[in-house]
């Protein structure tokens, strides 16, 4: 179950359910009261008997304690659990919005490529991710000093890089395979040194260039054969004693993909990831610039990251589901 506030006036709950052959009537109940719409959802042929649902009701999400979705008539329950705040995508606060003042936000089509359907979601997600990364930087360095050279590898349109750079003085750099994203950053935020990079190593930087390299939602898509070469490339451009903050998708995200019916993930379970260590399934989105047909979805078992990645750089710490309550964040260093 996933919920968010839309324009601060209504809440939407969306998710996936296993249905029969017929359409199902879905009802949302919040704190014991049936609210909102009752809506029919047709099972999708391409997803087996999975059917998606999205139900809206006019109640701020922060007041919701418990929510469930069930089939009308039979009363078969699809969701019945505490409505956990970590699933919220809240509207940006005043503090979130401060870094956007005077900034030209990216084109909506570029936001949608990274899963931000509306500008307020882009701002809120970027702000929260930047907060987590700030905490990691401060934990390692003690503070974010203006002299720190920090690279966001796979920065895209700067969803987390922009709030970091506009809140904290440092020498900020970004690189990405998407030339449209880099053109936007160079136009909207020239204080960030952004460059186009290739889909495969090397990066366009000398050895020992950076005190820190951040990489969010990159290893979540790379094919397995590129994991260690790119990790070695990150190590190359880091100075000795530098920090790498890299995110991966773990068992939780794999379960989401399975329930959602993502091709290649329908029959995978956490024990499969535990056994394999890392699982990858290719897909090619024609709207993505700069990637090849090997671009896909990847899941990592945290123990695999600790064991295998440490052959390149020691993994100091893993924070499970640290980013948007979905992706794991790994802290590595170059000895």
Segments from the language model and where they lie:
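Class I (Rossmann-like) S-adenosyl-L-methionine-dependent methyltransferase catalytic domain
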Residues: 88-145, 156-202, 224-229, 245-335
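A short glycine-rich, Lys/Arg-flanked "PGG" loop and its adjoining helix->strand segment in the class I
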Residues: 228-240
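Class I SAM-dependent methyltransferase core
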Residues: 152
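Nucleotide donor/acceptor-binding cores
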Residues: 147-149
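A short SAM/SAH-binding and catalytic strip from SAM-dependent methyltransferases
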Residues: 212-225
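A short acidic, Gly/Pro-enriched loop at the edge of an enzyme's catalytic core
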Residues: 201-213
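Basic, ligand-binding patches in group-transfer machinery
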Residues: 1-90
